[in-house]
Amino acid sequence: VADANKVRLVGYEGGQSMVAPPALWGNTAVVQKLADANRDPGIAALYAKDLANWQRISGDVLCLFSSVSKYTAQGGQPNPAGCWGQLEYDDSTDSPKMAGVRQFLAGAAGKV
């Protein structure tokens, strides 16, 4: 559509999270499993691949949503609305999502 209309394809609020359907938000086991997946080191490679796919398909700007966002809600339970931040806390040092962003940027030097 963007090419056909000769306009840029710019992504807003990009990135990923895994969110249970609202009907399952009360299922702590499901919500916890999704939060754990967002913390899994394997997410780094998937995140980098997702960003590379965007660059390959669009080659244009993609604004990632939410630099920092806690994965827990009040009471310390996993957040049923999703785990959106690249960092879970502003002093995080081991975020798999941020590692994926860094992997992508390292491989895309001169292209972004």
Task: Show where each model-derived region lies.
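Glycoside hydrolase catalytic-domain groove-lining segments
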Residues: 1-23
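Acidic (Asp/Glu)-rich catalytic clusters
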Residues: 3-4, 54-56
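Structural recognition of the beta-strand scaffold that forms the well-ordered cores
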Residues: 8-12, 60-65
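Aromatic-rich peripheral "rim/lid" segments of glycoside hydrolase catalytic domains that contact
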Residues: 22-54, 63-112
